[in-house]
Amino acid sequence: MTRENIFVRSLESCETMANASVICADKTGTLTQNEMTVVAASVGIHAKFVRKPYRFLGGEVSRGSIPGNFGPAGDLSSPNLAITPELAKLSHAAITVISTTFEDLDPETGAAVFIRSKTDTALLKFARELGWTDVKHPREATNILQMIPFSSDRRSVGCVVKLPNGGHRLYINGASELLTKGCTHYAANGATRGGGVETAPIGKAEGDSISCTIKSYASHALRTIALCYRDFSHWPPNGARVTDNGEVRKVFLFGTPNV
C-alpha cells in the first residue's frame, strides 16, 4: 500500500473496502487511468478553449462550442495565440508558484513524472503543453512570503509572493463556484502601460457569464478550478486578522478569475 501511495487513516477501512462490490465516482479518469487532464479552459470571460473533440457521459463535445457557454471555443493548444504574454505569465505563475507538486523520475519506467496532487499535476502538464517554462524556474525566481494551505471550509489554497516593485501578490486556486462570488474584476485580454494585466469590472452580465461557464463544465462532470489573484501594497494588509497559526483572514473576497 505504501508503494501505491495509499494512505490509510483507520485500519478498519481496509476490511470495509475488501467487502465493497461497487465504487461510484464523479470524476472520470481518476479510476480508469489514475490521472487527471485539463480538457477545457476559460481565460477571463470571452476566451474559451477545449481540447480536441472529447467525450463525456456518452456525448461528444466539439471545439466548435460548449453547451451553455457564450460564443465559440478555440483549440486548447492555442491559448498563447489568443492571450497576451502578460496574461500567460500571470497564469503560469498562478499554477506553478502555488503548487507543492514536484517532478521526479519514475523508478519503474525512468520517465519524468509529477509527484503529489493529481489536480496540480494536470495543471502543470497543461502549462508544459503550452510551452511555458518549467516548474522550478518560477518558484526559484519568486520570493514566497507565505503559503496558505488548503482548507475544506474555503476549498482553496493560497500563496503570497513579493513583487519586484515592492508590492505583494496573493494567488488563490480553488473551487470556482466559491471564489468567483468574491471576485470584483476579471482578466481582460490586454496589457496596461506598466506591463501588467488589464482587468475589467464584473457586472451582472459578466457574473452571469461566469456562472454559466461553471455550470456548463459541471454538467459534463468536469472539476472546475478558478485561478485568482489580488495585489496588495503591504502584507498582511491593513485590517486583516492574523490567527495563532499565522493564517491571514478576511482577504479572500476579491480577485481576478482566470478559469
Where do the PLM segments sit?
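Conserved cytosolic headpiece of P-type ATPases
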Residues: M1-V259
